[in-house]
Every structure is written in C-alpha cells, then in structure tokens.
Curated annotation (Swiss-Prot):
Known catalytic reactions: RNA(n) + a ribonucleoside 5'-triphosphate = RNA(n+1) + diphosphate
Key word Nucleotidyltransferase present: yes
Alphabetical list of CDD domains matching this protein: RNA_pol_B_RPB2
Assembly and interaction partners: The RNAP catalytic core consists of 2 alpha, 1 beta, 1 beta' and 1 omega subunit. When a sigma factor is associated with the core the holoenzyme is formed, which can initiate transcription.
E.C. number(s) listed in UniProt: 2.7.7.6
Entries under PROSITE patterns matching the protein: RNA_POL_BETA
PANTHER family in UniProt: DNA-DIRECTED RNA POLYMERASE I SUBUNIT 2
Family recorded in the similarity comment: Belongs to the RNA polymerase beta chain family.
Listed name of the protein: DNA-directed RNA polymerase subunit beta
C-alpha cells in the first residue's frame, strides 16, 4: 500500500490485517532517554542531571563551619557543528553551567553547634565538554561518531532461587538476594544443615540472627516474628494445649487425646475440615501435647521463678524430661512451634550457631549487650583486622543498608520489593527497611517449604534496560562522588582564611569531565558506530547488551542467560544476535517494542472480550502479562471481529495451551511483532531455519552501499520504515510545494497560519563514513511537486525512492556450473561488471602530522631529498597531492621532511652544500606514502595549522574556497527569504480591500476591490512598498510588522553567517606538539571481483569464484542470459527455503514488469486505459483491497509514473509470517505465464544445447558485503621482525608474514619435503645469520649456504638460564669428538 510516508512507490501488500498503529519510531528509546538526562524538552520536571546533583549536594564540613549547596544548572549551546567536529577531531559537546552556593556558619565555640549564617556566596562553575547527542542519535567523540548501546541488566529488587547443592548430592539449596542499584548486596542462604545464613557482598556468611540482632531485635522478638507461639498448660501432670482446628489440618503426627486421655483422632490420618468442625461442636477445647514431642521443642519466653525472680530457663532452651519436671510447677509456659505448616527450624538453628560466636566475642570485647556484639561481628566480617568500637560498628551496619548516600534501590527496586513481598512501603523510600529484611527471610523459609514462588532471573520482569540517560547519570554520580571526597578533604585542610574561600576553590570540575569522557572513550557500551548502511546504523542504536559495567562477563555467562526466553515474545528479537562468544548476550529490540519509564520492555496487544477482538491496543510488560491468555495474530477472525473457532491455540506464562475463545484476554497486534527490524526485512522468514535467518539478518547489516541503489522486487514493507527513521534520508518538516531543487539544496514553499514560508534542506555529498563507505544524498522530488509532512524528499545511501535498498535484484539459476560453484561459491556474469551493478565507492582518510621536535620543526613541503622530480609531479607547491590525482601504491600523498640531528659536516659536505643549496643535508624524508593496497582518486584535502604558524598556499586556497561557498549559500538563503517576504506581503494584500483607486500592471482597481494574488506577485518589491499606502492603517501596520520580522530574520541569518566565518578564521585546535595536520581523502571504486563475499537475505552466503563472459552464461528460451549461478546443494541441508520462494515471487515480478513495459512499447491510443486495467488486475491478488482503491484514485500522470517503476519489476511486500500462500502463487504464476513448478528450460551458453533438466530460475535480491578481497589480499617480501623471537610479525597492518603453524609443518613432514621444511623453519623464520647470508648469496647468484641456529633456540636456552640452569652449547669440532 502506498503509505503517505513511503516515497513514490506502490507495493502489492500481502498483509492479512490492516496496520492499526504505526511502528513506533525506531530510535525513540535513546532520544527520550538523553532528552530526560539533559532536560531538553520538558522545562518543568526535574532532569536526570539535576537528580544526580541533588543526591550529592549539599556537602557539609565535618566541623559544621561551611556547607556547599547546589542551586541550579544550565546547559549551553554547542560551539561547532557536527561536520566541523568530525573534520577537526573535536567532541560535539556543550558546557554545563552549575550554580553553587557556599554558606559560612556562625559556630558556638563551646558546643560546636551552628548558631546562624555568617555569609553566603554564590558562584557559577563550568563543567566543560558534556557530549551532546546529535540529531542522528549518536555522539561525536574526538571527531569519531560513536553510539552508546542500551544495557540489559538485572533489575534491582529481591530474587529467590533454587540451585543444586555443590557439596551434597541431590539436594537443592535455596537462596534469596536483595539487589540494589547502588550499595551492598545482601544474600540469604541455607547450608546443608538447614541453618539460615546471610552474607553481605559475598563476604563470609554469618547466621541470619546476627543480622537481626545487629538491627536491634531482641531474641524473643525474633522468635515471635518467625514462629507461631504455642502456650502449654500444665494440668494434673498432663501438658495440654488449646485445640485450634487450623493447626491440625492435613496429617496429624501424633494421636490426638482429649483432657481425659481418650483418643479423638489417630496419628497419620488426614484431618478434614469437616471432622475438625465436628470436634469443635463436640466441645473439645483442650488436647494433650505428647511429652515425647515436647522434649525436642524450644522455649519461646524465659521461665522465671515467681517468688525469687530468678530466671530458671532462658528463651530458646531445648526442653528435656528433667527440665519439664522443673517446669511443671509453672501453670503455663510458651514454646516456639517449629512444626507448624510453612516454617522450619532454620531460625532456631541460626540461634544455636550464633550463640557460640557471641560467647567468644563477649570474652574478647567485654560487652554484654548481644545486639552490640552482633554489630561488631558484622563489622569484623566486612573489615577483617581493623580495630572496632561498638558505636562505629552500629553506624557501619546502619550505613550499609539505611543510608541513602550509600544505598539506593531506586524506584524500580522498591516497586519490585513491594510486589514480591506484599509490602506497601512508599516508592520514595529507596533504602532498605527492617521489614524488607524480615519479610525476605520469611518468604525464603516459605520457598524452602514449598509455599513460595521461585523467580526466574532471565524473565524480562527481572531484567531491565538502562539507556544512555541512565548510564550517563550513573557515570556522573561516580564523578561527583569522587569530587565530593576531594571537597571533604579540602574542608578538613582549611584552617585559616575560611572567610575568603570561594566555591571555585573547593570544586574541581575536571573530575566530572574526566569520568564522563572515560565512559565515552573507553566504556564497553560506547561503541564505534557501525555505519556501513542505514540498517546497520538503526540496529546498532537499538541494540541491547548484557555486558558492560554492572552487567555480565562474557566468559562466565551461562547457557540460560543466552537462551531465548518465553517473555522475549514481542519484546526482544529471537533471531538477531551475533554468532560466536557473544551469542545471546547482545540482542535487539523487537519491531513494535517500547521501553517504559522504569526501563521494562513492553509489547503491544489488542484486547479481547468474550471472544470479540476490540480495537483497543495496550502495551504490557512481562510482569503485567503473567497469567493472561494470549492468542496468536494468525487466529481466524470474522468481519465483526469475533474469533471464529471455539478453541484456539494461545500462550499463558510461556506455555502453549488450547483455550476456549471466551477465555482469551489478549491477541497479538500482528505476526511480525516477534522479530526485530533486521529479521523483519527477510521475506518468507517463516520458511527459513533460525540459524540461517540469524546469518541473514546479520549480513544485511554488512551490505555496502552501491553506486546506484535498487529497491527489492520482493520486500516486506519494512523498507520504508527504516528509511523513515534513519537520519540518512531527508524528511520534509512541513508540507508544501517544491520551489527549487538542485544537487545540494531543496527549497519547499508552503503556507501555515502565519502565511507562506520557505524551508531549506541541505544535502551532503561524498562524505566518508566510519566504515569507509560513501555517504551521499540525492533529491527524489521534482520542482512543482507537492510534498506532505514527513515525506522523504532526498534519499541517503542504500535508499531508493524512500525505501531501504541494500542490494540488487539479479536473475539467478540454481544449477552447478562446471564445478565453479562448489561449496557455496558464486558464478557471476560479466554483464554485472559491465553495468556496474555491484560497484561501490569507498573513501579512505590518510593523515599526516608535522610536529615540533628538539632539532627543529617538521615541514610539509614538495622539497624532498633523494626523490625523483617525476615522483613529485602530482604534488602542488605545498607538497600535498592535488585533488583529482590518480593514486597508485607507493605514490607520495603528502611530502614531509623531518630535521636530522646536526652533526659537524665534513669539508666535502660543506662544499656540496655551498654549491647545491642548504637543504639536502640535514633533513630526512618522512613523507606519507600510499599503502600497497591503495588505489584511487584524491577527492578532498583538509589542512589544519596551529596558531602562530604560517598557513601555506594550499591552506589559504582552501580557506578562500570555503569562504566563497559560505557566501554563495548565504546569498541563496537571502534570496529565498526575500521571496518568502514578497509572498507573505502579497498574501496579506490579496486578502485586504483597497482604500483608494489604484492602477496595477496597467489594470485599474476601484476602492474596496481586492487584487488577485497572481497580479500582486508580478510587481517588484519596491513597487509593493508604495502600493501598501493604498490600504487601510491596519494593513499598513501588519505590513510593517512583517517587514520588521523579516529584517530580524535577515539579521539572524547574517549573524549565523558571521559566526561560521569566524569559526573558519579561527586557529585550529591541534594536540600539543603538532604544528600542522593534513588529511587526504582518497576515493576508490571497487568493482565486483573474484574473492568478494556476496549473500542473499536468507543466510545464503558465498564467495565469487568466477566471472564468466555473458555469452557463456546459460540463457532462457527468450535469449536472456542469467546473471548469477548458485549451487542447488546449498539449500536442502541448510533449510532456508525462503530463498526459493523469494526467487519465485521475484520472477513473477519481473515477468509482470515485462508485460507492463510491453504496453509502454506498443504505445497504442488507449495505452493508459490498458495500463490501468493491467495494474488493477495485478492488484487484485492482494488480500486487502487497499491498492486497488488507491490505483483507482490516481490521475493519468500519476498512474504513468507508478507504471514506469513497475515496468522494471512489479514490487511486492510479503510481511514476515504472512507470506504468499500456494494458492496465491498459482494465481500469480498464471498471470505471469510461468510454469506451475516455477522451473524454466535453460540452454548452455557455451554449446547452445538445451540443458537435460528444467532449472529453477528466479529473481533474488543479492547483497555485496563489506568483506572485500581488495582489503584482505596481502603479500610480504621482506619486512619487520618481532624483537624477542626474531620471527616475522603477523597481520596485514604490520606488513607481516603468513604463519607456518604446527599443522602446516605436519603436512610437509607427511610429504617428506625435508629441504622445504628446513628452509621454512630457519631462514624464512628466525635464523638471523642464515637469512642475512642467504640474501647475500642470492644477490651474488651463489648457492644458499647451510643454515645457522634459529633464534628460538637461544630464547629457550635463555629462559632456562633465567631459571638458574646453566645451559651451554658445545660444538662438535671444539672437543675434537
């Protein structure tokens, strides 16, 4: 369907359901997050940056003399544009102005308390260089474009787990963790003996009761918190307890006897609710508590002799018969009922454990209070070996979990805690409370006894996304915390002159800048942006990484973390993830997924009520959809929106179930919501194996932009969405008519409530991207065309008419071709080369610096010693290659000489210098040469000169050119502004009536008449000026206002222009020691070559093995030769059948395109009618009749423009999981006059004979990937050697050799090639003397002498010597043996 945003192209869409909501902006997550951090849009709410400042400030002096407070902050404007930052190697950033208040307090000398305020000083402090996000959602750091990837990390909160015990076989260990966003982690765990322990930050574990005591709980309080208290009454030597039916539900462990000793219920039998109620009715109030069970219970409260007040037994005393005999005198006593349902003896066991610890501590510390001792114990575990005071220990425990400066659960953590433990603590309490810790322990005991719910840490309710704003806020917090420490140190150092101190003396903003820049330059999540094509860029910004600070370590990440989880459905793409060690740790957001304010990923669903699908769309997180029954998007629905079948397949909590239609709560928004952006570009994805789909989506990101882009015949409808959200394409901000368009500018004239306006859009040309591909924008609108808001008016690289186009449609055949396509190799026709189908342009940047050295300054010059004049012919007078020069390997790009240390010259040298000029003697050639693989044309040169150094002729020329361009651009914009002003004035006058009779353009107008706008537009500006006087005062005033408005606009434009000129004239900022920097840009055309890697969209990749003359390629009966021959064996085992279906639909598109072209060629009278009929016939295939309606609404001119596009191939959109069916294929085949099996007869191009079998010929979208053979081919003659081993270095970058490894040695051994092997292991490797003498012998034409001892042997002997082993090498002859 032609969406208003889809450029000028019609596609036949096979969607089952019309799209109900637009796909959310693909980059909104990052933009929203950064805007919140810097508070760019919202002016009222608190920004991320302010929150961080408020969490650190105020900072108080320990002696109560001073305090520093944060007042406000203000974000500045960037100094340079994005382009200038990239050229000059600067950071695109803003300055942050922070207002700080320093308060001096009056102090009471005796008490040290504050009495009042002595003085208040306010100062603004600048924090330099806070990187600013560009409008393309990236950052420019030191001239390089980078992206900050979103992090997927464990959400703060509480989590309960069960794991297999590492010590005891077949035993499960239960643990709980309270995870904060910042602060100490708290672990609760059972050991093998069922004691409940707690550990802080993975330190030594302590019994949990020690933690409770350190928090101030008494022994009895703890028992009451965890155990039901059972009161035992002593009557006539019997122990009785009240009969509470709830205590005895389920199985009863002992015979229940009443007061008289009659058995009312036998042991081991289940007591039903009914039976229990019957017993209550029968008047059973007391039951006997058997002595044998009582003897192993513990007292809940101490037993005190009422007469003497002496404590007979403390609480938690284990009862035995002798103790019971003593207790009998008491009428009642309490025991802790650890046999009740849902509790166990863990806490009692912990008490027994901690008793011994505290006994020891009592003796060493001389403190009786057990709560103080517990705090000391925790302090000793956390800080072993440090002396401790009880107050310090208490403060330490308090700081661990209850101090907002040290501990932060965040709003998310608090929400998760409340949800899991059933608390209602307010969400602004982001530290722990005692209740949190107690409830966690209680829940863990419940989990252990099978009554709680174990969490799944890979569930998306327990993982959240930290985007750029939050990551930056965390970094800023780290920087401020460092600064806070430094300020406190300065406070203590202040003794005298406190009155003179200013905020600036205390605050060093550099700490903040350094921390933030460290994050951008060295952080794991800040990455060099993948800019190969628009798709790579969009997916890079949508990436979710589980690595990074506070995340996982890839070496330790297990299988579960990497696996696809049921909650990923509609939130995280199950397909797109890298192959290799990062598999599953780096993911991508699904197409429709959104991230809410708390950082949880949400998926969209439609609500279903009583089996009827409503149009209400809800976004739910993984936690919110727990327990709901969700039907798939493919569920059959009738016209009224009711579900057709009574039972439907649905999902509930990750399980697939069969549910009645009335039970269904939600239905998926659409089938394609499961996968991410890259995977949803693969047509017929549902027919591909997941492994291949993964390769397909990863390889699309590596497709290089080609010379001309061509949209796929078989698309999925996602192509336009990526173009819509990628910054590469230019979109119209306001609707209007194209006024002027050229190669670099588009002007659009429109009208809004203020009258006419003209918008200006500038296009970039031939820029180098991060991956050295070319970035060029070109207009796709014509003068006079109407443009809507958001419509794409200029294509970027890899775009065609506002759609992503990363490859080319090629005619392919699945057939072997003389063995050349063995093992996935690809045979291509020479026609592809001739037509530059797969030719791409790459731009390389080479730079050279002239530095200040101790012997003088390096110089960029043409005057280079010992270089032939011919080799310098292509350099200009400044020594830099001219633009347009063809560069070949070994040519000089920039001439540079470096001063040599002055040695006293000999008389001969002095004479030569006197004759031939001063230069040659004391400089060395340090020029920049083109590398071995570099071939191309110099397209641009940039020269930067340091302040105080003279600019050379080339730099002055470049400056003049740049200035001229700026002047021209300024002039164009002024002209357009004048035009806009005239239009506004004409519009104003045409709406108003004349106040007097006037003659305009020879035509007379009476008073009160209105002049037509077209007539007014013919008058020049100055005549208009006088004409205004013929209108009313109000009109004249409006005219004056308009004039003033445009004068101000022109002033603004002028000041902008002056600012640009000023920046141009400014001295360049260069690193210290660098005097001049020259950057040379070389463009290379890379044609398709043998060895280049190509791929389809289904993970079908291969290397070009042969380029065959067009005449030798197999051809179709109509004489058309195929472009590419692929190996049919690559399909069945890989199970990516999508490519077969794609090529079927592709050939249909081609054939139907030929039929439309035929109508054009014949050009009969009623050809427009024929075109319309044909196009409508083709459109009838679509499932929704939207295209039909659209075509019917077109006028003839529009119809022809769409038909011209279709003549090159009818375009289809087959969305993922809604692909073309068999029935539709047969209909299409019939229409395109293709055999029903999709195969064609083929003829051998070499012999002209018909092939024995019919062959599958189709049209497939092929990509050329950026693994180009030109950049990989490498050979070494002689080159650098490694210092220690004296073996040649490795790698292309170092001009290294190919490693002849262990297995290669085996191969030569197997052949018995002894001499070759000896040569490989000695003179070609690390026999230093041997290679020197071999070179000598070769130059003299003698035989190569015998080899010496390899350096490796000396390395080995020296290593042995370092172990104090004396190793000597004896020669045979020496000892006359």
């Amino acid at each position: 369907m032609l969406n208003s945003q889809s450029g000028n192209r019609l596609r036949i869409d096979f969607s089952n359901v019309p799209q109900q909501i637009d796909i959310p902006n693909l980059l909104q997550l990052q933009k929203k997050s950064f805007d919140y951090f810097l508070n760019i849009d919202a002016k009222n709410s608190e920004s991320g940056i302010e929150k961080v400042f408020k969490s650190i400030f105020p900072i108080h002096d320990p002696q109560n003399r001073l305090s520093l407070e944060y007042v406000s902050s203000e974000v500045g404007k960037p100094k340079y544009t994005i382009r200038e930052c990239m050229e000059r190697g600067l950071t695109y950033s803003v300055n942050l102005k922070m207002k700080i208040r320093l308060t001096l307090h009056e102090k009471d000398e005796k008490t040290g308390e504050k009495i009042g305020i002595k003085d208040i000083k306010e100062q603004e402090i600048y924090i330099r260089e806070i990187p600013l996000m560009t409008d393309r959602i990236s950052f420019i750091i030191n001239g390089v474009e980078r992206v900050v990837v979103n992090q997927l990390h464990r959400s703060p909160g509480v989590i309960f787990k069960e794991e297999e015990s590492s010590t005891v076989a077949n035993k499960l260990v239960y643990t709980a963790q309270i995870i904060p966003d910042r602060g100490s982690w708290l672990y609760f765990e059972y050991d093998a003996k069922d004691v409940l322990y707690v550990r802080i930050n993975k330190r030594r574990k302590v019994p949990i009761t020690i933690l409770f005591r350190a928090l101030g709980y008494k022994k009895q309080d703890i028992i009451k918190l965890f155990y039901p208290i059972q009161t035992i009454h002593v009557k006539k030597d019997k122990f009785l307890t009240e009969f509470n039916p709830n205590d005895f539900l389920d199985r009863v462990e002992y015979d229940l006897k009443d007061e008289k000793g009659n058995i009312i219920h036998q042991a081991g039998k289940r007591m039903t609710k009914k039976k229990a109620e019957q017993l209550v009715k029968d008047g059973i109030k007391w039951v006997e508590y058997p002595v044998e069970i009582l003897t192993n219970r513990y007292l809940a409260n101490p037993i005190i002799n009422k007469e003497t007040g002496e404590v007979l037994f403390d609480s938690l005393t284990l009862l035995d018969e002798s103790k019971l005999a003593k207790i009998k005198e008491q009428k009642t006593f309490d025991i802790a009922n650890d046999l009740a349902n849902g509790v166990d003896a863990a806490i009692i066991n912990s008490f027994i454990q901690d008793n011994e610890t505290l006994k020891l501590l009592k003796q060493t510390e001389n403190i009786d209070d057990e709560n103080d001792l517990a705090a000391i114990r925790i302090y000793k575990v956390m800080r072993p070996g440090e002396p401790v005071v009880k107050d310090a220990a208490k403060a330490f425990v308090n700081d661990l979990f209850f101090n907002p400066e040290r501990y932060d659960l965040t709003k998310v953590g608090r929400m998760k805690m409340n949800h899991k433990l059933g608390l209602d603590t307010p969400e602004y309490v982001t530290v722990l409370t005692n209740e949190d810790i107690v409830k966690t322990a209680k829940y863990l005991i419940k989990v252990k006894n099978g009554r709680g719910h174990i969490d799944d840490r890979d569930h998306l309710g327990n993982r959240r996304i930290r985007s750029i704003g939050e990551l930056l806020a965390n970094e800023l917090h780290v920087g401020l915390a460092k600064m806070q420490k430094a300020i406190r140190d300065k406070f203590t150092a202040l003794n005298t002159d406190i009155d003179k101190v200013m905020p600036y003396d205390l605050i060093n903003p550099k700490t903040i800048t350094v921390t933030i820049m460290e994050f951008f330059t060295g952080g794991q999540l800040s990455q060099f942006m993948d800019q190969t094509n628009p798709l790579s860029e969009v997916t890079h910004k949508r990436r979710l990484s589980a690595l990074g600070e506070g995340g996982l370590v890839k070496e330790r990440a297990g299988f579960e973390v990497r696996d696809v989880h049921a909650t990923h459905y509609g939130r995280i793409c199950p397909v797109e993830t890298p192959e290799g060690q990062n598999i599953g740790l780096i993911n991508t957001l699904s197409t429709y997924a959104k991230v809410n304010d708390l950082g949880f990923v949400e998926a969209p669903y439609k609500k279903v009520e009583n089996g009827k699908v409503s149009n209400e769309i809800v976004y739910l997180t993984a936690t919110q959809e727990e327990g709901l029954v969700i039907a798939a998007a493919s569920t059959k629905i009738d016209e009224k929106g009711s579900i057709v079948e009574e039972f439907v397949e649905a999902r509930q909590d990750g399980e697939t179930i069969l549910a009645r239609r009335e039970e269904v709560h939600l239905i998926d928004l659409c089938s394609g919501m499961i996968v991410g952006v890259a995977a949803s570009l693969i047509p017929f994805l549902e027919h591909d194996d997941a492994n291949r789909a993964l390769m397909g989506s990863n390889m699309q990101r590596q497709a290089v932009p080609l010379l001309t882009a061509q949209a796929p015949i078989v698309g999925t409808g996602m192509e336009k969405i990526i173009a819509r959200d990628a910054w590469e394409a230019i979109k119209a901000k306001r609707a209007g008519i194209v006024e002027k368009v050229d190669n670099k500018n588009i002007f659009i004239l429109g009208e809004d409530e203020n009258g006419p306006f003209i918008d200006h859009y500038k296009m970039e040309k031939n820029l180098r991207t991060n991956q050295n591909t070319t970035f060029t924008q070109h207009p796709i609108v014509k003068k006079g065309e109407f443009v809507q808001v958001g419509q794409i008016i200029a294509d970027g690289p890899s775009m065609d008419q506002g759609e992503l186009a990363i490859g080319k449609n090629a005619l392919i055949a699945f057939m072997p071709w003389h063995g050349y396509n063995y093992e996935d190799a690809i045979v291509i026709s020479e026609k592809i080369l001739r037509e530059d189908t797969f030719t791409s342009v790459h731009i390389y940047e080479k730079e050279v610096e002239a530095r200040e050295l101790k012997d003088g300054v390096e110089e960029i010059t043409k005057d280079i010693p010992n270089v032939k004049e011919d080799d310098l012919a292509h350099l200009d007078e400044s020594g830099i290659a001219k633009i347009g020069t063809h560069i070949k390997p070994g040519m000089i790009l920039v001439g540079k000489v470096s001063p040599k240390g002055e040695v006293k010259p000999t008389p001969e040298e002095r004479l030569l210098r006197a004759i031939f000029g001063e230069k040659a003697g004391h400089v060395v050639n340090k020029s920049l040469y083109a590398t071995a693989s570099m071939e191309g044309v110099v397209v641009d040169v940039k020269i930067f000169t340091k302040k105080g150094y003279e600019k050379d002729a080339r730099a002055i020329k470049a400056y003049d050119e740049e200035k001229l361009n700026l002047e021209k651009e300024h002039h164009d914009r002024l002209l357009m502004m004048d035009r806009e002003e005239t239009l506004r004035v004409c519009s104003l006058l045409s709406k108003s009536a004349l106040n007097s009779d006037e003659e305009i353009n020879g035509q007379k107008y009476k008073k009160g008449a209105k002049v037509d706008i077209k007539e007014l537009e013919k008058i020049n500006r100055f005549a208009l000026n006088s004409l205004v006087k013929a209108y009313s005062k109000d009109v004249q005033k409006e005219y004056e206002d308009l004039k003033n408005h445009f004068q101000n606009e022109k002033k603004k434009l002028k000041s902008e222009h002056d600012e640009k000129l000023e920046i141009l004239e400014k001295d360049d900022i260069l690193p210290s020691g660098v005097v001049k920097l020259v950057k040379v840009y070389i463009a290379t055309k890379r044609k398709l070559k043998v060895g280049d890697k190509m791929a389809g969209r289904h993970g079908n990749k291969g290397i070009v093995s042969n380029i065959v003359p067009e005449v030798d390629m197999p051809y179709l009966p109509d004489g058309r030769p195929i472009d590419i021959a692929l190996n049919p064996l690559g399909v069945p085992s890989r199970m990516n059948i999508g490519q077969i279906l794609e090529s079927h639909l592709g050939i249909v598109g081609m054939r139907l395109g030929d039929q439309i072209q035929e109508i054009f060629d014949k050009k009969q009278k009623d050809f427009i009618k024929q075109l319309r009929t044909k196009i409508l016939e083709i459109c009838s295939v679509s499932r929704l009749t939207l295209e039909k309606k659209f075509v019917e609404s077109l006028n003839d001119e529009q119809l022809i423009s769409y038909a011209r596009d279709w003549a090159r191939g009818v375009k289809f959109a087959t969305p993922v999981f809604e692909g073309v069916t068999v029935e539709e294929f047969s209909k299409l085949f019939e229409m395109a006059k293709i055999a029903m099996d999709g195969k064609s007869e083929l003829y051998d191009g070499r012999t002209g004979e018909k092939m024995a079998e019919r062959v599958h010929v189709g049209c497939m979208y092929m990509l050329k990937l950026h693994h180009l053979v030109d950049e990989k081919v490498h050979a070494r003659s002689t080159g650098p050697y490694s210092l220690v081993t004296q073996q040649p270095v490795g790698g292309k970058a170092l001009f290294g050799g190919q490693r002849f490894g262990e297995m290669e040695v085996w191969a030569l051994e197997a052949y018995g090639a002894a001499h070759t092997l000896r040569e490989m292991l000695t003179i070609k490797s690390d026999d230093v003397e041997g290679r020197f003498s071999a070179y000598k012998a070769l130059t003299k034409g003698e035989n190569v002498p015998a080899t010496g001892i390899p350096e490796t042997f000396f390395v080995l002997t020296n290593e042995l010597k370092s172990l104090a082993l004396d190793v000597e090498i004896f020669d045979k002859d020496e000892n006359n043996e």
